[in-house]
Amino acid sequence: MKNTFARYSLTIPSIPENVISHLRQWNEWMVGDTSDDSPGPSSTVSTMTTTGTVDRRSLLSAASMVRQQSDTTGVRRLVRARAVQEDDEAGPHSSNNLAATMSPNLSRPTRYVKSVSQQRSESYIQLNQYRLMEEIGQGSYGIVKLAYNEEDKNLYALKVLDKMKLLKNFACFRQPPPRRNKENAAPSVLRNPLQLVQKEIAILKKLSHPNVVKLVEVLDDPNDNYLYMVFEFVEKGSILEIPTDKPLDEDTAWSYFRDTLCGLEYLHYQKIVHRDIKPSNLLLSDIGQVKIADFGVSCEFEGIDAFLSGTAGTPAFMAPEALTEGANHFYSGRAQDIWSLGITLYAFVIGTVPFVDNYIIALHKKIKNDPIVFPEAPILSEALQDIILGMLKKDPGHRLMLHEVKVHTWVTRDGTVPMSSEQENCHLVTVTEEEIENCVRVIPRLDTLILVKAMGHRKRFGNPFRNKLSAQSSIRDRRKSSSVKDPTYVPPPNSPPATSNNNLNSTKVDRPEIKCIEMNLSGLTLKVDEAMQSKVESARQ
């Protein structure tokens, strides 16, 4: 792929100098050696600043070649978003406007949209006001695409979920696990998977914390097989992709760890265990703030802790107690998150996880039995090693708890930088049954609305098409009878000859005698049969 991306001419109007410098560094990193005749990074960037048009097709084809590469700065995503802003009639982009574009306003409440319109072009898919662009990641049970909102000019991360898979496999949001004291509890009722989806969306809509990714909008349509969840876009992506030869230094890891600790405390305060804390699920904003993402295997609990059974999440980050099989085996959800947090901190500073194996059974055996070993390089402080070992105790009863991690000497730097209290960091979120029912609404189809309207006109819930059907049948009967009596009627060639009126009595079929009933209707006495009488009586009612 050497020198491939440099052959494309990217042109974006009025890009600030600081962004151009980032683009130049990124382009040099992507192109590498430019000793051949292809244009180098400098010529590419200068073309971008002097031309006022965008070759979108070239841009998209070029960016698709490198979509699998790591983009820690988010510049490539910004370039693609700029390429589709054809309707933006604002003035020249200043640095403040650029910051506003990359930092969406997340203070507004989560919206639920009940109709989705799609438009397809050669370069993108239009979904309501969102332009879907490249795939930027994959969650536990769905893909994530970069989306540009034409209304507020912001970038968002749009997660696409298959509703049929959700209903079939309990895919995205799982049923709460059984409790430890289930022999004394009432028999649990298996909830509809759609109800589990509704409850999880209702919870995510209310979560609001600087260190938790915000759910902005939910797009759903009964005529569409997909559910679209719009999250805030965190510009720099994942903190770290492991394994890596460039781990974080201890000071950077300290800052990121404290943010993650605040977000995890907020989730536990809301009675939610994440179950999949790892570096790739920790996203970094443009101001260096960590946000916890991907709640695909998260679980809500009641009481003081979640007693889980079974495995969920990433195997290398699972606690030893989660790997023990058995129908009556349960383990603490809070302790599982602390273990995953310890593995994450180890990966921050070492660049890999402590237990690695190509075979899952061998990996489980190492997690259960092998001790934590620190390599000779990089050299870690004693306080950092102590907190990692404390969070990675094999016995969950001896493992550090979250409030103990908050006051550890490495986290607080010997008490000079204390963490915020739980009261300052958290506020309780409650979700009522009514909110759960209303978070996912389904609009009826058009034919159902027409049927209900017809019933309203008749002022009763009968069959609004009964008279129409009877009228059509009577019209067919009249046409049939009139055609026989019509003198111009010509029967088919192979039809039997018609009988004369003189022979009608001889061929007449014996029919039962119809009993007539006299009815008084508006002063008139009529003779009708029983069927007609019932129709008249129903019409009177």
Curated annotation (Swiss-Prot):
Biased composition (Polar residues): 93-106
Record-annotated Protein kinase domain positions: 130-411
Start and end residues of each stretch annotated as Autoinhibitory domain: 437-442
Named cofactor requirement(s): Mg(2+)
Biased amino acid composition, Low complexity: 497-507
Cellular compartments annotated: Cytoplasm
Residue segments, region Calmodulin-binding: 440-465
Keyword ATP-binding applies: yes
Gene3D superfamilies: Phosphorylase Kinase, domain 1, Transferase(Phosphotransferase) domain 1
PROSITE patterns per record: PROTEIN_KINASE_ATP (PS00107), PROTEIN_KINASE_DOM (PS50011), PROTEIN_KINASE_ST (PS00108)
InterPro entries with a match to the protein in the record: Kinase-like_dom_sf, Prot_kinase_dom, Protein_kinase_ATP_BS, Ser/Thr_kinase_AS
Enzyme class: transferase
Catalytic activity: L-seryl-[protein] + ATP = O-phospho-L-seryl-[protein] + ADP + H(+); L-threonyl-[protein] + ATP = O-phospho-L-threonyl-[protein] + ADP + H(+)
RP domain: region residues: 169-190
Active site annotation, chain numbering: D276
One Gene Ontology CC term in the entry: nucleus
Function of the protein: Calcium/calmodulin-dependent protein kinase which phosphorylates cmk-1. Component of a calcium-triggered signaling cascade involved in CRE-mediated transcriptional activation, probably through cmk-1-mediated crh-1/CREB phosphorylation. Plays a role in salt-avoidance learning behavior via the phosphorylation of cmk-1.
Family: Belongs to the protein kinase superfamily. Ser/Thr protein kinase family.
The protein, known as: Calcium/calmodulin-dependent protein kinase kinase
